[in-house]
A protein has these predicted regions:
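A general structural motif
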Residues: 12, 51, 78, 107-109, ...
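Conserved donor sugar-nucleotide recognition element shared by glycan-biosynthetic enzymes
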Residues: 15, 40, 66, 85, ...
Length: 171
């Protein structure tokens, strides 16, 4: 927290040791959970009973079991739970969506190819803390397939308005 305080120039007065302490003190309407994926469930377990909405960074959960537990909490307590997939907001993807929705421009989609990747987290310079949980199977849940594969799955689910594909191939 101290490193982030210095890096982003904010006071340590707004840093709390636990989410419970922060919620009790600040009483937020919503929180964002942009840490390791395993902790998404804990954040929802703490926030949902207090009626606090939650936005997590992709993917939603490390497992179907965690996702189902979050779903039950959301339903029981009536909160919103949003998964942020940043690529959805890219202007290029917004334009692609717009063109696809206008039937007369592109026509029926028959095949979609998604390619994602980079040189690797170390080569692109991610910080030590992020690298530690990103490469931990328990904290991350699925490695590169959940870190990058989820973008294509999200974009295509959005573009196809939830219609399931006939087949999927991954290389």
């Amino acid at each position: 927290a101290k490193r982030y305080s210095e890096q982003y120039n904010y006071s340590m007065d707004i840093v709390y040791n636990t989410i419970e302490e922060m919620i009790k003190t600040k009483k937020p309407e919503a929180v964002t959970a942009f840490g390791n994926i395993y902790d998404h469930l804990k954040i929802v377990e703490v926030c949902a009973p207090a009626g606090i909405h939650v936005m997590v960074e992709k993917p939603l959960a490390v497992s179907l079991d965690h996702a189902k537990k979050m779903e039950k909490l959301v339903d029981k307590h009536g909160i919103h739970l949003l998964t942020n997939f940043e690529t959805t907001w890219y202007p290029t993807n917004q334009k692609a969506y717009e063109l696809i929705q206008q039937d007369t421009i592109i026509g029926d989609l028959r095949k979609i190819v998604v390619r994602d990747g980079h040189k690797g987290p170390k080569k692109i310079g991610v910080n030590k803390e992020f690298l530690e949980w990103l490469t931990d199977p328990e904290l991350n849940g699925g490695g590169a397939i959940t870190d990058f594969g989820c973008y294509g799955a999200n974009l295509l689910t959005w573009i196809m308005e939830g219609k399931k594909p006939n087949s999927v191939t991954a290389i």
